[in-house]
Amino acid sequence: MFPALAQLFESVFDLFFPARCLHCNRGIASPKAVLCLYCEINLPLTYSHLMHPSPLKKYLFPALPLERVFALYVFEEGALIESLLYQFKYDGNKAIGVFFGRRLAGLIHHSKQAYDGIIGVPLHPKRKRKRGFNQVDVIGQTTAMLLSIPYFGEILQRVKHTPKLSQSKRDRGEILHNAFRLNPRVILPKGHYLLIDDILTTGATLSACSKVILEIAKVSLSIGTIVYRN
């Protein structure tokens, strides 16, 4: 009864207060969509999940035995994708994170990839307190729920607070040395996991996390991000 009432209330609410596209303000069928169809189809897809080997592997440390590396979208400065990321991370619009998670789950499902779980890149506690949430958790929890697999948001711990500066891959790698460790209270069963982050830039953060995860016996790893920035 209660789910039916909730659905009825949502339908009435949508009738009087229709959802609007975050970008162009056109009406959209559901608030979960975030964008109208026109704006969504103009998001720049990478199609990197279809490429073997992935061209994005070159951004990760070459010694890492990664299965797949892919990103949903290409970052474009001043464009819609940058605006979405900013509103999500810094304005706290978690609906955008849910949207990203739904699109990531759809890509994984349609490309017939199979994972035993999803792992999120952690924030340092200081940065998480300042922001109020870890944006990767929103994406990861949504994706995992839709794929009916577990989300491991606490398997990694960030123990070194690093400055948010634009550096070379080598410099970032040195700064991030020993920045992550495994949480001794969380057990990761053997299997193939997807490590996710919101954006791939130099690859140093994802490489540092991957190195720690791959120290676990009988674990294989792929990497997926929402955006790739050249």
Predicted segments with their positions:
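Glycine-rich phosphate/pyrophosphate-handling loop used in enzymes and phosphotransfer proteins
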Residues: 1-197, 201-230
